[in-house]
C-alpha cells in the first residue's frame, strides 16, 4: 500500500485539450474529500493558413503554461503529477532536433481527400478493419500521414499526437499512449503494438512512429522551468487515457459491465466497454469501431450525430439572441407537440454545415409527413424533432451493439455536455427502456485524474483502481 493511500491523496493537475476550448483543472483534498477547480479555460479552434487549416500550437502551449502557473498559486501543497488528454488524430511532425516543422494540420483540412482515395486503393477497408478494428475515416492519422508523404514531408520525420506532444513539452519523453494510438488507424487490434502491415500498405516509415506506452505510464519529470515553481519541484508526468473520450469513459462510476455509455456533445458516441475487440464484417458494416480504453479494455461504439444538428438549425433560424438560449429552448421543446415522425440523423447531408432545417423538412416530406415552418418561432418544434430522432437512433445503435456482442444492458451512463439535457435523457430512457444516469459534464477531467491517482499508487492500468477513483471523484463533482 502506498503512502498516500494511508493518509491524504495527492494533488494532481489534469489538462484537457478540446477542439473548441482547453481546460486546466486542479484536484486538491480536504482530508479524503476531493475538491476539483477549473483553474484556467481558454478558447481554441483551427486557423486558416493560406489554403490549409492548422492549429495554433504555440498559443495552445502558452495557455497550458498559464494554467499550470495558476495551479501553483492555488495550492500550498506539492503537485504530484500532471496528465494531458485531448482530441485524437491530429499530430505534430518533428525534425531531427525534435522541433516542429510547422503548426499541425486540423483533421478537417481537405488534404486527406486525395490521400483517402490512395489509401482506399492500396489498403481495402475490410483489411484495415480486420487489422486495426477502427473504421477507416479520412480524418484518422493514417490518412493525414499519407497526405504528408504526398506533400513531400520527409518520411523519417517523427510525429507525436497532440496530448502526448504537450506532455513532452512539459518534460516527458515522446510517446504514444494506447487509447490515443488506436485513433491513428495504425495500432494492431489484438496487440499493444503498431501494425506493420498497415504501415507497409500505406507506404509509411515505421521508424517515425513514437514509442507506445500503456495507459497511466509515468513518462518523466517536469522540465526545469516548471521545477522552479515550488509546487512542481518533484512533479511527475503521466500519460492518462490521452484520448478524451477514453478519459470520459474512465470517469464513469459504474459497477459491473451490464451498462452502456453515451458520450454526448456535438457528436454522440453510444457504446460499451468490452474485454476483446469485435472485428467481424457485421461490426464493420454496422459502423462500429474498436478503440482502446483505460484498464486494458476496448471502447466499442459508433459515431452518431449529436447537438451539431440543433446548433446548425439555430444558426439558420435564429434572429433574436434570446431565441438561441439553449436551456430555454430545451424547456420549450419539452412543451412542444410530439412530432409525427423522426428523421435519420446520420443522413450524410446532415453531417455538413448548411440549412439543416430545410434538409430535415425534406426528409419529412419524403416520408409523407407534415413539415415544420422554417421560422424562429418553430425552433422548439425542430429541437423536439432532433431530440426524438436522436433518442431513437441511440436505441437502434445500442440494439445493434447487443446483437453484435451478446452484452446484456441494464443502464446507460451519459457523459459530456449532453448530460445536462434532461429532456433528451428522458427521451433516451423511454426509447431504450433503460434507466439513465447523468455523469459529470467534464467526465474526461475526472477520468484523467482517476488514471493519474491509480498510477501514483502503483496500479497505472488497474481497472478496479481507476473505477474506485472515478467513484470517489464523482461523489463531489458537479453535473
Give a label for each model feature.
Residues 77-86, 157-158, 211, 404-416:
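Short glycine-rich phosphate-binding loop at a beta-alpha junction
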Residues 1-102, 130, 227-237, 432-434:
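N-terminal glycine/serine-rich phosphate-binding loop of ATP-dependent small-molecule kinases
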